[in-house]
């Protein structure tokens, strides 16, 4: 059994990531009375913090794009009617934050600032320009409008001012000066009894990452970011919260179920696991202390896999060698993936069977308990797998969530079988060929050729205009 020596690990972290995603409370502020002090151009701080800057810049080496839909075409069906069915890649280095949100098919191909499918909030975990705009315009001013409105303004990749108070004298002296640059994140931490200003250094390290690596949703007319933590951080607590406010991200185009889309709940799952319970922070594992050429220690800002720096991360707490721990992690990952696939198979059938019931004349009242089960099953599945490190952060919680998802999906299918029988349908509902991403997308009626062509035109014509405008306004150095 893995043994963690908590006292062995306090040799880490000074400066913290230039990254991490987004979310929380939707009470927005008016335009600020204070001047804008956020400097979003990351290279500004290279002379003060050269080692940290160069290691942050090295996240550009994490450039591989992995197509999650091609790996698992079932996802296309589960997200039918939602932009994720078009395009979903596994995360790359933080140096690609702005590029990837611009180029994903999910953000569409807007032609002007009022065009496109998504709100401004979709920028919120991509750039220190977000913190700059919130300081400049207030939260109401920032969140207002469509995603395309932010194109000429949000141009610098996740960096220094996302996690540090770069305007402070302490930061200039080389101290980390951690900060929550997103006010909605600060409110969320307060909601769970963790006000940032009163937190210790190790708590603050993970809270800074938790500005973005969390579950969130878009609330109100302005689609402002909010974390669903009012009733707690467990999957059932958030499910209860969403049900209470009758929130849904979209309606599945097959089953007509009002669905929830989990984001990237690393903070929640880390909190539920052995590392979180012992306050082994994100920084301890993903941003260890390393030596520069002169032998000086600094915090490595090339956020990555702990096994890449085994001696500076895992070995500070664990007695096992690298190969032994890699074997443990691989086994946990395989166990979670095996159950994940089984849940997905059940959900795919449930969506198509629900469609068959609707086509056969099932009423809204007849479908409601079935759709509730589908909604809850997929939510629990999604929260378990949307956190890419669940097998390390909280494998037991991941398996528990997937187990309850399987139960809910089975309940939905049992009810569907009974309902279909009342409509005279007793044969098995056939599933179309979804063996590839392309076939699955065709099965839900996506015209991918048109979608891709429109996106390529957007990339060639609109993005260069955004960058030109940003340079004219002094928001980009080059």
Swiss-Prot record:
Q: Where does heme c 4 bind?
A: 282, 285-286, 393
Question: Per UniProt, where does heme c 2 bind?
Answer: 160, 163-164, 301
User: Which GO terms fall under biological process for this protein?
Assistant: anaerobic electron transport chain; nitrate assimilation
State any GO CC term: outer membrane-bounded periplasmic space
What EC number(s) does the entry state?
Answer: 1.7.2.2
Q: Which reaction does it catalyse?
A: 6 Fe(III)-[cytochrome c] + NH4(+) + 2 H2O = 6 Fe(II)-[cytochrome c] + nitrite + 8 H(+)
Where's it mainly located? Answer: periplasm
Q: Name one Pfam family in it.
A: Cytochrom_C552
The entry's Ca(2+)-binding residues are 215-216, 261, 263
| Note on how the cofactor is bound | Binds 1 Ca(2+) ion per monomer. Binds 5 heme c groups covalently per monomer.
Top-level taxon of the source organism: Bacteria
Task: Please give the pathway this protein is involved in.
Answer: Nitrogen metabolism; nitrate reduction (assimilation)
Provide the protein's localization.
Answer: Periplasm
Instruction: Give a GO molecular function annotation for the protein.
Output: calcium ion binding
Q: Where are the bilayer-spanning segments?
A: none
Q: Which residues bind substrate?
A: 216, 264
Q: Where does heme bind?
A: 122, 125-126
By its UniProt entry, which HAMAP family does this protein fall under? Cytochrom_C552
Question: Matching NCBIfam families, A to Z?
Answer: cyto_c552_HCOOH, PRK11125.1
Q: Function, please?
A: Catalyzes the reduction of nitrite to ammonia, consuming six electrons in the process.
What family is reported?
Belongs to the cytochrome c-552 family.
Q: What name does UniProt use for this protein?
A: Cytochrome c-552
| Species | Escherichia coli O1:K1 / APEC
